[in-house]
Amino acid sequence: MKNKLILGAAFLLAAITESLACTNLIVGKGASVDGSVIVSYSADSYGMFGELYHYPAGMHEKGTMRDIYDWDSGKYLGQIKEARQTYNVVGNMNEFQVTIGETTFGGREELVDSTGIMDYGSLIYVALQRSRTAKEAIQVMTDLVKEYGYYSSGESFSIADPNEVWIL
């Protein structure tokens, strides 16, 4: 009986550990009854409350720089070039219905680029502000990482628009 109790407690602890990760559910056009593309995103971690951020659309002067802060800690990471035009974003979706969610899979701490400027949260919101399609968001994200470095540990991004869904 004692062994069963210990085994049960171990499974319970393993389940609790897994529940601290974010959860994404993605459905492509061919898998939904009405042809909709669906992305659901849940930040299952404690302390990640249901905040709904708004980034208004805008036109920016050539040469404008944008400050980047780590999404989790608020630490200043550096500056990037601002796009000439940015799009309206509410939560994790922009005015063109481009949607981005993420799931952290971590990784080895010694592999994190502490000199990088783009963390996972900044990648999401900057890409949403600069993209009209999911493919364009992927291009924006990969270009930003190539130019400015990636500050976070491992992430899986679910990126969708009304026509397709991708995992990056």
Briefly describe each language-model feature range.
Residues I16-A21:
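Sec/Tat signal peptide C-region and signal peptidase I cleavage site
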Residues V112-S114, S122-S131:
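Second-shell loop/turn segments in exported
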Residues L128, A134, S152:
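Cysteine-dependent hydrolase recognition
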